[in-house]
């Protein structure tokens, strides 16, 4: 299965949580597509369906990662030392597009992915245009010199509360630069996700 490129608002409505798209539309119509109003309620899911939904929530939260790629992240996490769920989240958080989003260079992960693919960022002084590029402790991420004049970066940085940047990252707004201070141990997601259900999904 490839990456989903359809309207994320519909995905959010189907999952019942906001993973992207138009937030106002989602809030007004927070019920599954094809359903007329909230009165019908959501269908009760099977055990498999519940676990599939949690996996989809996490996959789409990180910008609609391809199914095959997401499964490979899980396989790496399951073979690594430590808690599988924690390692899975660490791998997702260390993606370049996610770090660009977390630092405030982009308003959404999807926007971050596009900005990375268009070659606007350097990692440790070298251009990297691969959204899934995996960052490590000590890595420096910065906007390329010729891209610093673009309004999108100024607007995004100015609108983002610096307190929203997680502790494992640090941002230097004046120089359009960020740093991975450490590998995150405690990861706060924007929506509730039962990671244990995702582990169980891949074990079914």
From Swiss-Prot:
Residue intervals passing through the bilayer: none
Keyword field contains Transferase: no
Signal peptide extent: none
Gene3D superfamilies with a match to the protein in the record: Ribosomal Protein S4 Delta 41, Chain A, domain 1, RNA-binding S4 domain
GO cellular component: small ribosomal subunit
Function summary: One of the primary rRNA binding proteins, it binds directly to 16S rRNA where it nucleates assembly of the body of the 30S subunit.
Gene Ontology biological-process annotations: ribosomal small subunit biogenesis; translation
Superkingdom classification of source: Bacteria
Keywords from the named record: Ribonucleoprotein, Ribosomal protein, RNA-binding, rRNA-binding
One GO MF term attached to the UniProt entry: structural constituent of ribosome
PANTHER family: 30S 40S RIBOSOMAL PROTEIN, SMALL RIBOSOMAL SUBUNIT PROTEIN US4M
Similarity field: Belongs to the universal ribosomal protein uS4 family.
Coiled coil: none
Subunit structure: Part of the 30S ribosomal subunit. Contacts protein S5. The interaction surface between S4 and S5 is involved in control of translational fidelity.
Domain S4 RNA-binding residues, every copy: 94-157
InterPro entries: Ribosomal_uS4, Ribosomal_uS4_bac-type, Ribosomal_uS4_CS, Ribosomal_uS4_N, S4_RNA-bd, S4_RNA-bd_sf
Protein name: Small ribosomal subunit protein uS4
CDD domains in the cross-refs: S4
Keyword Ribonucleoprotein listed: yes
Pfam families reported in the protein's UniProt record: Ribosomal_S4, S4
Underlying gene: rpsD
Provenance organism: Sulfurihydrogenibium sp. (strain YO3AOP1)
């Amino acid at each position: 299965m490839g990456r989903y490129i359809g309207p994320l608002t519909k995905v959010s409505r189907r999952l019942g949580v906001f993973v992207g798209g138009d937030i106002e539309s989602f809030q007004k119509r927070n019920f599954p597509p094809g359903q007329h109003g909230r009165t019908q309620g959501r269908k009760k899911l099977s055990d498999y369906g519940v676990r599939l939904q949690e996996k989809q929530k996490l996959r789409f939260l990180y910008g609609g990662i391809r199914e095959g790629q997401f499964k490979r992240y899980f396989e790496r996490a399951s073979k690594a030392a430590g808690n599988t769920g924690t390692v899975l989240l660490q791998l997702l958080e260390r993606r370049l597009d996610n770090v660009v989003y977390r630092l405030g260079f982009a308003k959404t992960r999807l926007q971050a992915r596009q900005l990375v693919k268009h070659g606007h960022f350097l990692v440790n002084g070298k251009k990297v245009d691969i959204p899934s590029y995996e960052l490590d402790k000590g890595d420096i991420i910065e906007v390329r010199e010729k891209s610093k004049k673009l309004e999108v970066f100024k607007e995004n940085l100015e609108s983002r509360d610096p307190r929203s940047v997680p502790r494992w990252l640090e941002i230097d707004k004046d120089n359009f630069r960020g740093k991975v201070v450490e590998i995150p141990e405690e990861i706060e997601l924007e929506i509730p996700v039962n990671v244990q259900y995702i582990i169980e999904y891949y074990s079914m």
